[in-house]
Amino acid sequence: MSIENPIHSVGRNIQEKASVIWNVANSLFGAYKPHEYGLVILPMTVVKRFHDCLLPTRQAVLDKYEAVRHLAVKDGFLREASGYAFYNTSPFTFETLRADAENIEDNFRAFINGFSDNVQDILAQMGFGEQIKRMADSNLLYQVIVDFCSEKADMSPRKVTAVDMGYVFENLVQRFS
């Protein structure tokens, strides 16, 4: 029986996640120049991480949203239901987005618009709305979403710790620099 060094395990996990994410660049080839890949990959990684974090409490958030949608201030209720400082009230997941290629742009925008204001602010600062349009116009949006749906692209906290996720982002930023 061999015991794996936890440091090597962490390093391998970070490299694996960064490589899976980096492979999305293959889908962008042609419509994007290599120096532009980060315009898509970094915000998509943020979106996928948030999505995967929220997946276990998704139904609780949707139920709470139905219960408080008439209230002027509902943010605190929804944060509590999600267990995070952010939430998503959209009925979409990456899996349901993947199931409807015909309406991918509208559905993905509805998914993004379902995030709490703090997440939408982050994505706006990254100029992600323009990239969604550009990917859709280039017929790439669906494929990028499919690429992020793989089992290896699972970025839930049970697969990738917060510290590891920081290293994954650092690795990606270095690749795009």
Model-predicted regions and their roles:
Residues M1-S177:
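Non-catalytic, mostly N-terminal accessory regions of nucleic-acid modification and defense proteins
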